[in-house]
Amino acid sequence: MRKGNTANARECALSVLVACRRNGAWADAALKAQLGKCALSAQDAALCSRIVYGVMQNELLLNWYLSAYCTQKLDHLQPPLSDILRIGAYQILFLDKVPDHAAVSESVELCRTNGRSAASGLVNAVLRKVAQNKSNLPPLPEGNFARLSVAYSHPQWLVKKLVSLLSVEEAEAFLRIDNEASPISVQVNPLKTNEKALVDELRGEGVCVTPHPWVPGCLELSGTGDLTTLSAFYNGRFTVQDAAAHLIVCAADFARGQRVLDVCAAPGGKSFAAAFAMENEGRILSCDLHENKLKRIREGAQRLGITCIETAAVDGRAFREEWAGRFDVVICDVPCSGLGIIRKKPDIRYKDAQDFSALPEIQRAILENSARYVKRGGLLVYSTCTILPEENEQVTDDFLKAHDEFTYEAFSLPNGVSAPGHLTLWPQRDNTDGFYLSRMRRKTHD
């Protein structure tokens, strides 16, 4: 691997894409690991990240155009040739600052450095055709589902689902946002600072800061570089969390001195939000299956100056008798398909619908078990980062049908919207991640 130039960034990007395709690795984890090995400059690391996420966000569209100029089917090419072609085509079609000739020549070089010199002529010819025709590319397929699927690189099953839930026009708006860069959203830590002071501090460190348009204490950042190098992060004056997830505070109605159970707590954002709202007074029990994730929660709490959080390694489906009826608020942020956060994790879109088929059963089991921990008069909060009804309102509706000791209870959002016990947030409507949130009250007498 060559050092100190943008070609090195391309080699690094190729390694990430190959790891994702060959090993099923998640892009964010694979990218972080690869950047740790490559020792790239900040500029090259940014280019590497842009290529990785850009190729993933546009894979079906890139395949469509490449297939028009390649004499062989892309999936018949020896690995990693298809990814080399996508890397080159992405730069030609989407990165104005990269000259076409550089995108072509460096892609040819990737062939040579990855044992595919014999295919360098094919890669050169295909990418030159893409560059020559980029103002006159092949038309997209006809029909709304096929067109939207290729144009925004989402599988047709998901496009059809979105159209059934929204409309063709609004589904397209959702898909468009999925392919945009996701803002880095952080929450102010009121135990250590306030919004104005944090904004001033971050701007003083050269960070571009925009307060969220309607979620108090939520800031959107850009130009941060590595967040962990910021003094404000090191000193615990903010935590990373999307605006939608922070709205758990609205549904949970936390108060000082409460006992709160966070059933599926990792990576800890909702437990931290609870601690902020409770002014660090009370008890929060944060649970997860894996001790390594609990360790990160404890480290985060220490950084933020939170002392009311304890952790426990627990399966959310396994009943703990000693917790029965003991908690004022129980939070169930259950494992889900993640289809509301595709702009953060673009590789989620390429999952098959069948990959998610077992989730509602798991979600129901966690909700059923967690409800047993809510004291009479207490709150049960259920949330996901997906937009699929079968993981959202269908789960909570079915739960309430089977448990008349619980009922939906209305709550309000900071933008004035009143939710009749549950709601779905949409990125194209609400400037948040896609997110489902519900609030259920246990009756004082069962």
Where are the regions that the model predicts?
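S-adenosylmethionine
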Residues: 1-446
